[in-house]
């Protein structure tokens, strides 16, 4: 009975090749004609993103991608016209142009001249020459878009958001990180507050507004009223929002992840608003909010006890706050308390006693912890990642680290030990 691999049906070969990484898929196709035919089966390339340097004409490039059913493309360098890509990939599903600094409104305008119904995701992050003009083209011809990444596109204004709100009603995820000109007016457009001009993107599930410095609590009011299906909201580094704005968010029952990292005006009062509402958060980040203290941990334990991930790095918390929190947070999986310099071994002992489901903990820069506290933490049954960062070990403690379980990663400055 023949047992050689060459006797396998092409369908079985294709299933095997599907487990290979992209480089090995290509190598397998070069072995023989039978393997080449099997390796070109569309199931082998399902979900693969082609990463391309567009430098010179290659007539076989796009027919080859289409033959394998590849519909996701990342352009690493763009020295040819973008229209070359669009014309070559008739059924393109995802186009990643992040970091293509030479892409202009003119180049994008020549590429998008008719409706592209198949395109679902477009990434223009750090395409710094893009302006509202390009968003007009996108809103007109890419009405099926579900994901739009505009992080670092610093020339976009509220007018661009009005165009998005007018044309992209199917949008589910929008990243506007560091779009410095955006204000409450633009967020109002997205949330459907100007229905006479645009319906809004009312189906949004993820919205990133990181480092949009002009936003105030009014934006949060717009979001709470219009974007009621939002599941993830990133407001990190938005210095213009305050505790009062969190009162608007506190009744968004669909919200699961809220990032308030480095929002300087957020205090214990804001956390109280969140905890007293009807939120069902699974992730909360208030790192570097230096007005957040032990009282916030009491509020979190009272009203946000369903959290799976909690980040409190550099917050003004102590062992007392840890004691208030851990007794109600038994489902917590990730706890980041790096640079919380008031935490001692007592806090770690409380964590080890009550948070048995923890898989990761960040203790970076916790200068008052010792070997005794670490030994308790490393006994957590589910722990996979322990970040010690800049914690200074004595020679004896470095030797003791060798006794830590090999089942999790110990990270210190410049190292990662498993």
UniProtKB/Swiss-Prot annotation:
Domain F-box: 2-48
Coiled-coil regions, chain positions: none
Chain's role: Substrate-recognition component of some SCF (SKP1-CUL1-F-box protein)-type E3 ubiquitin-protein ligase complexes. The SCF(FBXL14) complex acts by mediating ubiquitination and subsequent degradation of SNAI1.
SMART domains xrefs: LRR_CC
Record text on subunit structure and interactions: Part of a SCF (SKP1-cullin-F-box) ubiquitin-protein ligase complex. Interacts with SKP1 and CUL1. Interacts with SNAI1; the interaction requires the phosphorylation of the two serine residues in the substrate destruction motif D-S-G-X(2,3,4)-S.
Matching SUPFAM superfamilies: F-box domain (SSF81383), RNI-like (SSF52047)
UniProt organism field: Homo sapiens (Human)
Name assigned to this protein: F-box/LRR-repeat protein 14
Residues spanning the signal sequence: none
InterPro entries, per database record: F-box-like_dom_sf (IPR036047), F-box_dom (IPR001810), FBXL14_F-box (IPR047932), Leu-rich_rpt (IPR001611), Leu-rich_rpt_Cys-con_subtyp (IPR006553), LRR_dom_sf (IPR032675)
GO molecular function: ubiquitin-protein transferase activity
Top-level lineage group: Eukaryota
UniProt-annotated location(s): Cytoplasm
UniProt repeat feature LRR, residue ranges: 144-163, 170-191, 203-225, 229-250, 254-275
A GO CC annotation given for this chain: cytoplasm
Protein's GO biological process: SCF-dependent proteasomal ubiquitin-dependent protein catabolic process; ubiquitin-dependent protein catabolic process
Assigned keywords, A-Z: Cytoplasm, Leucine-rich repeat, Repeat, Ubl conjugation pathway
């Amino acid at each position: 009975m023949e047992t050689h691999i060459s006797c396998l049906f092409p369908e079985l070969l294709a299933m095997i090749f599907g487990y290979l990484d992209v480089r090995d898929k290509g190598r397998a196709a070069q072995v023989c004609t039978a393997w080449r035919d099997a390796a070109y089966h569309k199931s082998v390339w399902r979900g693969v993103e082609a990463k391309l340097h567009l430098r010179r004409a290659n007539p076989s490039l796009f027919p080859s991608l289409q033959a394998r059913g590849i519909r996701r493309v990342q352009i690493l360098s763009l020295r040819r016209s973008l229209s070359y890509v669009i014309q070559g990939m008739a059924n393109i599903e995802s186009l990643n142009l992040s970091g293509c600094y030479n892409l202009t409104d003119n180049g994008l305008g020549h590429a998008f001249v008719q409706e592209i119904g198949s395109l679902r995701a477009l990434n223009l992050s750090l395409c710094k020459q893009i302006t509202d003009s390009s968003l007009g083209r996108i809103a007109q011809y890419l009405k099926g878009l579900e994901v739009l990444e505009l992080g670092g596109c610093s020339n976009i204004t509220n007018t661009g958001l009005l165009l998005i709100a007018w044309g992209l009603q199917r949008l589910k995820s929008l990243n506007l990180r560091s779009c410095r000109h955006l204000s409450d007016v633009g967020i109002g457009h997205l949330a459907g507050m100007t229905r006479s001009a645009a319906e809004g993107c009312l189906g949004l599930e993820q919205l990133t507004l990181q480092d949009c410095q002009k936003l105030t609590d009014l934006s949060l009011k717009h979001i709470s009223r219009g974007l009621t299906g939002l599941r993830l909201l990133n407001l990190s580094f938005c210095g213009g929002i305050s505790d009062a704005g969190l009162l608007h968010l506190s009744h968004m029952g669909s919200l699961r992840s809220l990032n308030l990292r480095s929002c300087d005006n957020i205090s214990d009062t804001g956390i109280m608003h969140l905890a007293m509402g009807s939120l069902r958060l699974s992730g909360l980040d208030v790192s570097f909010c230096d007005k957040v203290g032990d009282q916030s941990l009491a509020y979190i334990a009272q009203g946000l006890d369903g959290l799976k991930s909690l980040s409190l790095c550099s917050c003004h918390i102590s062992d007392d706050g840890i004691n208030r929190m851990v007794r109600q947070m038994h489902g917590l999986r990730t706890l980041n308390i790096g640079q919380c310099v008031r935490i001692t071994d007592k806090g770690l002992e409380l964590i080890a006693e009550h948070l048995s489901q923890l898989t990761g903990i960040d203790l970076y820069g916790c200068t008052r912890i010792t070997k005794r506290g670490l030994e308790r933490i490393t006994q957590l049954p589910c722990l996979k990642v322990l970040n010690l960062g800049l914690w200074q070990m004595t020679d004896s403690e470095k030797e003791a680290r060798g006794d830590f379980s090999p089942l999790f990663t110990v990270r210190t400055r410049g190292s990662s030990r498993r």
